[in-house]
Each structure stands twice: as structure tokens, then as C-alpha cells.
Amino acid sequence: NAVKEMPLPLVIKPCDNMGARGVKLISERHEASLAFREAKEASISGKLIVEEYMDGPELSLDALIFNGHIQVTGIGDRIIQRAPYFVEVGHTLPSNQPQEKLNLATELFCSAIKALGIDIGAAKGDIKLTKDGPKVIEIAARLSGGWMSTYTYPLATGVNLMKAAIEIALGETPTDLKKKYDFVSVERAIIPIPGKILTIKGVDDARKIKGVKEVIFLKEAGDSVEELRSNVGKTGYVITVAKTREEAIRINELARQTIQVKIGEPSELTWDVLR
């Protein structure tokens, strides 16, 4: 009924999963049945959310909450692709959105944290910058995933967010939240076409490139690569850092070009992806 009554486009998703599992864009009414089934299969409780599609750049925000204070630590630009699914293929930190928009997003994030009653600990938010202003996609009582709180933020600032969050959990005041430097850190996923991985080459050479901080592989030769419909099942990641945004992105692209993932025995999904 919600799909019939609400204006298109819409987004349907499970209310109790993670990693964009079961999240899908509905652009036409006839797409609703399949999207409903996919979301239902990904839901632990069977409960779903149908909401407006929010068009615009997406931000990822982290915050620490302690001593009655909300300290927003970092804001990154998320790159979402693979419509009608919502797959994060990477992020760049810090965001290069106008400061005025970042201020509005920060205000909304802090208001949402208070509304949820998160008065101690950590919080992460995904916020869209729409033509009508910032809108909340998700708020959670934890630090961000996707390598942001554990890799890109520490690499860009020198601040260990995980340590700070643990200190708060122990009832202590974080001791080291002041930025030591102001770099740009970039994370991008390695996403081959679907099929069976025959070989992975060039990883050691990629790691030797100046500015490459991490090359992380979650798959190896013999594993299968499926078509990505969520943030689960990626083959690997490259994380880089530099003094400028352009340089950090350039280094990341070079590292990923250095790595060769050879695919054989293509699955039936391969040709859909290529088309």
C-alpha cells in the first residue's frame, strides 16, 4: 500500500540489517514486487521500511559523545553506485562539500543523536544533501564502518578514534582528539566482473607505491566473485593518503590499476554486468 500511495521514486529496505543488504530503488510501480521480496529476504524480523528517494551527495559522519558533549570528528564523501542497488564503492575524507552544507549536516546529525537518546559513546550517520536540505538516511550508536573510523580518519588526522571510543566506554574522557595533521585519505573498493578468480597479481607492487597505506583483499584465487548488490562480498580495498585530494585519488587509481585480478569461468551474471 505504501508503494501505491507514495510518489516515486522510492527506496525499500529491511529495518534490521546492515551493509545495504536488501536496499533497492523503485522507479516504477511494477518493480515493487521483486524489490519487496529482496528486502524481505534480507530482513531478520520481516519488517521493512519504504521511504522517499533522497537525491544528492551522500556524507558519512562520525561523532563521540561524552561529558554532555557531542564532538563530530570526521565527515567523508561517500561514493554510491550500482543502481538500483546502493553499493558504496569508496569514500574520501575529508569531504569537499561547501562548509555551509557541512554545517547544516552536522546540526542535523547532532539533533538526531539527541533524539535517539545517545548520551555517551559513539554515533555514525549517513546523510544526503538534497535540494531541500540535509536528510537522514541512517543513524547508529557506533563508529562508522567501511574503513573510515579505523583507517581513513586516523590516516588523515593522526587521531585514533577506536582508542577514544574505548576510553569513553571505560568511563574515561578521551585524551587525544586533537588533529596532528591535515591530510586527505581515500578508500576505494576493488570490484572485478563476476566469475571465478584465477589469479591476483601486482599486490606487492601496489603496496610499494608512495602514499598507499593499505591493500586489503577479502578474496583469493579460487573464490567466486558475485554481482554486487550490497556492501557485502567485495573483493578488496585500496587505502591511500596524500596532502591533496587530487593526489590521494590519483595514487589510489594507480594502485588499483597495478593490481590484476584475472577472472575465469564467468557466471551468468557477468554478461549482464558487461552489458
Regions found by a protein language model. Give the residues of each.
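Generic preference for hydrophobic
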Residues: 12, 50, 72-75, 136, ...
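Active-site "cap" helix and flanking loop/linker of ATP-utilizing ligase/carboxylase catalytic domains
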Residues: 103-125, 131, 140-198
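A short, glycine/Asx- and small/polar-enriched loop/turn
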Residues: 6, 129-135, 229-234
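Short, flexible turn/loop "capping" segments at secondary-structure junctions
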Residues: 12-17, 85-86, 145, 228-233
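Internal nucleotide-binding/catalytic subdomain
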Residues: 23-134, 143
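Short, well-ordered beta-strand elements within core beta-sheets of diverse protein domains
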Residues: 24, 52, 154, 235-242
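Peripheral (often C-terminal) accessory segments that flank ATP-dependent C-N-forming ligase machineries
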Residues: 164-275
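A conserved helix-loop-beta module that forms one wall/lid of the active-site cleft
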Residues: 1-22
